[in-house]
Amino acid sequence: MEKIKLGILQVNHDKSEDIGDKFPDDAHRFRDLFDSLESRFKYRVYMTIGDELPNDINEQDVYLISGSPLSVRDNHSFSNKLYEFIQSCDSQKKPLIGTCFGHQAIAVALGGKVEKSKIEWNVGLEKTNFNNFKPWMLPEKD
């Protein structure tokens, strides 16, 4: 079976003593997770936090945008290029998934709004309530 080419757009490069020195970076965590389930992927990490993005959207079969302690509400040096890349993925129907910062970046790039949480940020599951539903959001569930 041919491996799926997965491009990981890393937007976190934590070098703090508390986190960065004790845990693997996001790209390694995702590779470890996916490889523990089934080794069907060939990985390429793009250090998007350092302005690195694929030269051609078709370099990979699918893309994943990592999490980050950064906020999409701030303008980072890589933000506009990342949003343009997300819009290209959307218009060309290229599979794309985002986690944490990544899903927020996808929302902003596609016209959504990200607001500061009233309860500070957290790690883990959080209940989400939708105000309106789109046809692709099936079945409708809160």
Feature locations, PLM:
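Conserved catalytic-core motifs of eukaryotic protein kinase domains, centered on the activation segment
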Residues: 74-76, 108, 118
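Short loop/helix-cap segments at secondary-structure boundaries that form the rim of catalytic
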Residues: 53-59, 105-107, 138
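Pocket-forming structural segment of enzyme catalytic cores
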Residues: 110-142
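N-terminal beta1-alpha1 cap of cysteine-dependent amidohydrolase-like domains
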Residues: 1-77, 81, 90-92
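Catalytic nucleophile loop
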Residues: 89-110
